[in-house]
Design a protein with these regions (language model features):
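NUDIX/MutT-family hydrolases
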Residues: 63-69, 76-113, 125-133, 151-152, ...
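Short acidic, glycine/Ser/Thr-rich loop/turn "cap" segments at secondary-structure junctions
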Residues: 48-52, 87-92, 120-121
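Active-site-adjacent beta-strand/loop module that shapes the phosphate/pyrophosphate-binding cleft
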Residues: 39-74, 181-185
Length: 192
């Protein structure tokens, strides 16, 4: 996070901060919640770090949280000396400063609800053509649960907008999996 400048609105600040911390640009950010508990600054170590980083006295902190669904293959800017931005698997997230673990928990809840109403958003995270295994893995990551392979294939069969291709994987050591693609036209027709 960072401070909001006087000459920018919240969305502009969120894009600027994302770029400063990660190097990512042209990302669709969604504002999902404000965090302003009076106890956010109860740990003196957090306050000390923040005052040093911001070079000003801190009495109260309000966070307007944003998130985005971004393909993990997007490279993060490694040239940023002050920040060690990296992709981290959800189970590997350790204790964070302030209430940032709560913010992540709330973000996960928001993403799950968002995906329920906008299932097409998941397909933006997959390659143009993908396997059932790749789609199942994505569902498992989002919903933090395991899906039976056969039942998941049945689930895919019910998704008219997930179109099987004649093409299969090449050069794999296991049985080649069929590719699928997301058909936005069919999806939009069904969703009306």
């Amino acid at each position: 996070g960072s401070l909001i400048y006087m000459d920018e609105d919240l969305d502009e600040a969120a894009k600027r901060v994302l770029n400063e911390l990660t190097g990512l640009k042209n990302v669709n950010l969604m504002q999902f919640k404000a965090f302003g508990s009076k106890n956010r600054t109860k740990d003196p170590r957090d306050v000390h770090w923040l005052e040093r980083a911001m070079q000003s006295k801190v009495e109260r902190i309000v966070t307007i949280a944003y998130l985005s669904l971004v393909k993990i293959d997007r490279a993060l800017n490694r040239d940023l000396d002050n920040y060690q931005a990296s992709w981290v698997a959800m189970p590997d997230i350790k204790a964070l400063a302030f209430d940032h673990n709560l913010i992540i928990k709330e973000a996960i809840t928001y993403v799950r609800q968002y995906v329920e109403f906008n299932p097409s958003s998941l397909f933006d995270l997959l390659p143009r053509k993908f396997t059932a295994s790749q789609l199942r893995t994505l569902y498992e990551l989002v919903y933090d649960k395991q899906y039976d392979v056969r039942n998941f294939h049945k689930k895919i069969a019910l998704m008219e907008y997930v179109v099987p291709l004649e093409e299969k994987q090449q050069g794999v050591a296991h049985r080649a999996a069929r590719y699928y693609r997301f058909d936005k036209k069919i999806y939009n027709k069904i969703r009306r």
